[in-house]
Amino acid sequence: GASQYHLARTWWADGYEARAEAGEWPTPAAYLAEFARVTETRRLSLAEWASARAAAMTRIDGSMVALRRASELGVVSLLSNNPAATASALPILAPDVVEILGRNQLFSYMLGARKPGEEIYRRALAHYGVDAADAFLADDSLANVEGARSVGMTAFQLLRVDGQFQTDALLAAVETFAARSR
């Protein structure tokens, strides 16, 4: 093992995670091998990596309510800045999300671009054959929301106020988007 500080310095601060998210290591095996090489740690199995990743995640239950509702109103998809290992581990990390999304999962490593850059949104829209005006993005990052808006998508920033994510506002935004006149 290694301390979180060592991992942060060797992997994240030096830009390796961003490179992985952009597709430089396009398989979980390649990602995990490079992670071990760069951080000078033993190579983790995908299950070990997923366990560590799960411990670092924060579940936002109210967002699941909004995702379920959105799936009743139209097609839903995930668009995430993450490497191949996360994509492969998603059924372990968030099986309820996978159940709702089905195959509608796009990760930055697949698209060769990262949020908030405009290109990732264009590639995601093209992948689904959807006009930007007919697409809605929810994200907790203002930069990602602005990136989506810059290509013509409707976007909502999920805010945290007094330690609580404003998921009621997210659900309302989903309903408002679905009810818009076409």
Identify the meaning behind each predicted range.
Residues G1-M64, E72, P83:
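N-terminal helical cap/lid subdomain that shapes the substrate entry/recognition surface
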Residues R68, L79, P83-R182:
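Asp-based, Mg2+/Mn2+-dependent phosphohydrolase catalytic module
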Residues L73-G74, G152:
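Glycine-centered short loops/turns at secondary-structure junctions
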